[in-house]
Design a protein with these regions (language model features):
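Conserved mixed alpha/beta catalytic, RNA-binding, or beta-rich assembly cores of soluble enzyme
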Residues: 160-269, 280
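N-terminal, Lys/Arg-enriched amphipathic/low-complexity engagement segments
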Residues: 27-68
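Short, Lys/Arg- and Gly-enriched loop/turn segments at beta-strand edges
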Residues: 62-73, 97-108, 208-218, 307-310
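Bacterial N-terminal signal peptides that target proteins for export
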Residues: 1-9
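Bacterial N-terminal signal peptides
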Residues: 9-19
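Intrinsically disordered, low-complexity linker/loop segments enriched in Gly/Pro
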Residues: 99-196
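Short, structured beta-strand/loop micro-motifs enriched in basic residues and often containing a Trp
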Residues: 31-41, 69-75, 177-185
């Protein structure tokens, strides 16, 4: 890699994190957002955060969660990460993520986003799907979702797995991407692996990074095929770190079991290709695999998840179990 990357608040060794450097004086900050924004872009920050800092915050509530046709609240942010410069990696640890509402909403919206119905962009001869709004009850201290289905004479009771659909930095250049879009900046990836205990790596394109988050889901199946998860509000605790001089092209995710790469584009096959190439290069650069050995490893060990197949860009997650990687 040439000159050693200078690391602020964290040291990267073969893809694993060590104890933060002793000179980092972390603070715990509490932040209650007042209003959301519709795009991921460079704008006046709502909070300034130093590497190592912990932020206790929450997603935004509003009419969307409480009534038919209610307004979407937008994204929280941006947080300005002190010391972040283009070519760094922003490391976002999700220390805690919990629902803080007694209900969640999932909708079928005619002409909007769905993996199995026509949308507003393409004219079709078949009729749109009917509009439906399902209100799930959140019970047992936020651990179980319950939905009565009177048309089917059935009742669903399922364990919940809270996640954040959207984590992002400001995109490259002067671009502003709407909240529905995922891309190399993160955004609306709808990856169910972005949950408590996960660490998300995002490329930095601007001084300060400009971090955003939102779109809490109490639960979501792979693909998000109807166009929404169990949409609800969340309490979340982040810790922010920087890896100076470590340049990545696309988002990465880690947890105790897996390293993961995310590709977001259409068609779906290209999203898979992006995530696969990113994983091969991660093994090559950080775990010191020879390139074609890395490809063979990915070919036999990778698990692939369609995170979403409904957004303007589709998203695919490629996962490699850590137990097969060198320590």
């Amino acid at each position: 890699m040439g000159r050693k990357a200078r690391i602020v608040g964290v040291v990267l060794l073969f893809g694993m994190f060590s104890t933060p450097a002793p000179e980092a004086r972390a603070e715990t900050r509490k932040f209650k957002p007042q209003k959301g924004v519709p795009t991921f872009a460079v704008r006046e920050p709502v909070l300034r955060v130093a590497p190592g800092d912990v932020v206790e915050t929450e997603t935004l509530g509003g009419g969307y969660y409480d009534k038919e046709g209610g307004k979407w609240p937008g994204e929280v942010g941006p947080f300005f990460i002190e010391g972040a410069t283009p070519g760094d990696t922003l490391v976002v640890k999700i220390l805690r993520l919990r629902t803080n509402s007694d209900h969640a909403v999932s909708t079928h919206t005619p002409g909007f986003i769905s993996a199995v119905a026509s949308d507003r962009y393409t004219r079709m001869l078949n009729a749109p799907i009917p509009s439906r709004r399902y209100v799930w009850r959140i019970e047992k201290n936020g651990t179980v979702g319950v939905l009565d289905l009177p048309n089917s004479k059935k009742r669903l009771e399922v364990p919940l797995s809270p996640m954040l659909g959207r984590v992002a930095v400001a995109p490259d250049g002067e671009e502003a991407w709407g909240g529905l879009w995922p891309g190399n900046f993160g955004g609306n990836m709808d990856a169910s692996d972005v949950r408590e205990g996960a660490t998300v790596h995002l490329p930095v394109f601007h001084e300060g990074a400009y971090f955003y988050f939102g779109d809490g889901h109490a639960l979501q199946g792979d693909g998000e095929v109807c166009g929404s998860g169990l949409e609800t509000t969340m309490e979340v605790t982040f810790q922010f770190e920087l890896i100076k001089g470590k340049k990545i092209a696309w988002p990465r995710i880690e947890n105790d079991e897996f390293i993961m790469t995310v590709g977001s584009v259409r068609p779906l096959s290209d999203a898979l290709r992006i995530a696969t190439v990113e994983m091969v290069e991660w093994l090559e650069n950080d775990y010191k695999f020879e390139r074609w050995d890395a490809l063979q490893t990915v070919s036999q060990l990778a698990q692939m998840r369609v995170a979403n197949m409904v957004d303007p860009n589709y998203a695919v997650v490629v996962k490699i179990p850590k137990r097969f990687l060198p320590k």
